[in-house]
């Protein structure tokens, strides 16, 4: 009898703690950011023109998510972001240098259960998969932005070596470029799912076969991109925008002017 009472008490405490955590995580987002639209973050996109989620196949069940410093086109089918957009500049990245990484990952409370990844999906996987940031934690200029970057809606299952070495180098190169660019640089990052891709976890989170990062310098109208396997690989020479579109089928810059490319810095 006493053991049962203890068990019931612990269960109630767990439920209360879980509810408090969910409320606390939701507090990271403004009322506008909780509305699942790009109204609160249109200025993160080039020319303040967000990606139209209606252009995403309906089978992917897309949603629009705003955070303070990045925007996400999210799929309830893959349980991953499809595209994450950032607007980077020297001021933001210089502020980010002093921000401490938290490593507090969490399921995005704005998303319906069954349409999102859970922490348990990444546990005990063979082969192991990292929770790979699409908007890097190192880009976050303040504590709130850092916390938001650890939402699973900003993650894809990523090969550990790729995440910690190859992709980390790509991210660092983009930051160096953005600091020197003298204006706003827009970065589009996301997964590519080729036929035969695998899944992880009870929620069947899709594992990308490739990853992309497209950089657009609004001042010079130059664009360049990486498209790399989600595996231990080497950094390849960046491609121009036309090659990126042909490789991925993604015309992410719409009708924005693109006048050239640029290599790694």
Q: Predicted regions span which residues?
A:
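Domain-level detector for secreted/extracellular nuclease and nuclease-toxin modules, and
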Residues: 4-5, 13-265
């Amino acid at each position: 009898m006493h053991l049962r009472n203890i068990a019931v008490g612990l269960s109630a405490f767990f439920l209360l703690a879980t509810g408090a955590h969910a409320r606390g995580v939701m507090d990271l987002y403004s009322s506008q950011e909780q509305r699942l639209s790009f109204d609160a973050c249109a200025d993160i996109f080039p020319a303040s023109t967000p990606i139209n989620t209606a252009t995403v196949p309906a089978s992917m069940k897309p949603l629009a998510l705003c955070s303070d410093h990045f925007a996400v086109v999210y799929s309830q089918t893959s349980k991953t972001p499809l595209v994450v957009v950032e607007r980077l500049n020297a001021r933001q990245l210089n502020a980010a240098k002093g921000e401490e990484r938290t490593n507090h990952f969490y399921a995005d409370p704005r998303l319906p259960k069954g349409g999102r990844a859970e922490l348990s999906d990444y546990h005990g996987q063979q082969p192991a998969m990292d929770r790979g940031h699409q908007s890097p934690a190192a880009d976050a200029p303040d504590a709130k932005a850092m916390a938001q970057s650890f939402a699973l809606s900003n993650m894809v299952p990523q090969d550990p070596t790729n995440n910690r070495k190859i992709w980390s180098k790509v991210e660092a190169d983009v930051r160096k470029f953005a600091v020197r660019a003298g204006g706003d640089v827009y970065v589009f990052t996301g997964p590519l799912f080729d036929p035969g891709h695998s899944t992880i976890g009870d929620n069947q989170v899709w594992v990308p076969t490739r990853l992309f990062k497209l950089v657009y310098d609004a001042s010079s109208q130059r664009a360049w991109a990486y498209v790399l396997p989600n595996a231990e690989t080497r950094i390849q020479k960046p491609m121009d925008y036309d090659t990126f579109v042909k490789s991925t089928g993604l015309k992410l810059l719409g009708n924005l002017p693109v006048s050239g490319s640029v290599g790694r810095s």
